[in-house]
C-alpha cells in the first residue's frame, strides 16, 4: 500500500494518551494492515514504533426528512490506529506550520 495514513486523530482522549503514555492516534485507510502502518509512520516521522493497535470504526447512520419522505444514508466506515513509540521519542504534528505563515505575512508588507 502506498501511504495508509490519512490524518492524525486529535480528540481529548487521544491527546491525553499522547501526553501520559506516548501513544498517537491516526485515521488510516480501511485496507491498511499493521505492518503498512508501522512502515509509513517510521518513514514519515523518523521514529521507531513499538506497537500498533487498530480498530475498525463503523460510520454513523444518518436520516434526512424532506417533502418527498425519509432519506436514509450512512457515513463511511474508517479505521483508527493507535501507535506506541519507543521510550523518549515523540511526533510533532505541527512542525513548520507557523514558519510558513510568518513568511507570507512578511512578503505582503
From Swiss-Prot:
**InterPro entries in alphabetical order:** Nucleotide-bd_a/b_plait_sf (IPR012677), Ribosomal_uL23-like (IPR013025), Ribosomal_uL23/eL15/eS24_sf (IPR012678)
UniProt GO BP:
translation
UniProt keyword annotations, A-Z: Ribonucleoprotein, Ribosomal protein, RNA-binding, rRNA-binding
Top-rank lineage group of the source organism: Bacteria
Keyword Ribosomal protein assigned to the entry: answer is: yes
Q: Name one Pfam family in it.
A: Ribosomal_L23
* A Gene Ontology molecular function term of the record: rRNA binding
The terms describing its cellular component in GO are: ribonucleoprotein complex; ribosome
Cleaved signal peptide residues: none
Q: Indicate the quaternary assembly.
A: Part of the 50S ribosomal subunit. Contacts protein L29, and trigger factor when it is bound to the ribosome.
PANTHER family recorded? LARGE RIBOSOMAL SUBUNIT PROTEIN UL23M, RIBOSOMAL PROTEIN L23-RELATED
| Family affiliation | Belongs to the universal ribosomal protein uL23 family.
Q: Say what the protein does.
A: One of the early assembly proteins it binds 23S rRNA. One of the proteins that surrounds the polypeptide exit tunnel on the outside of the ribosome. Forms the main docking site for trigger factor binding to the ribosome.
Report the protein name in the record: Large ribosomal subunit protein uL23
Amino acid at each position: 500500500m502506498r501511504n495508509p495514513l490519512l490524518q492524525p486523530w486529535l480528540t481529548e482522549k487521544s491527546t491525553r494518551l499522547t501526553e501520559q503514555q506516548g501513544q498517537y492516534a491516526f485515521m488510516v485507510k480501511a485496507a491498511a494492515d499493521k505492518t503498512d502502518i508501522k512502515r509509513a509512520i517510521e518513514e514519515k516521522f523518523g521514529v521507531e514504533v513499538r506497537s500498533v493497535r487498530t480498530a475498525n470504526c463503523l460510520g454513523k447512520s444518518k436520516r434526512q426528512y424532506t417533502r418527498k419522505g425519509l432519506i436514509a444514508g450512512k457515513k463511511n466506515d474508517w479505521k483508527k490506529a493507535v501507535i506506541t513509540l519507543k521510550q523518549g521519542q515523540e511526533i510533532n504534528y505541527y512542525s513548520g506550520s507557523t514558519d510558513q505563515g510568518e513568511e507570507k505575512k512578511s512578503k505582503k508588507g
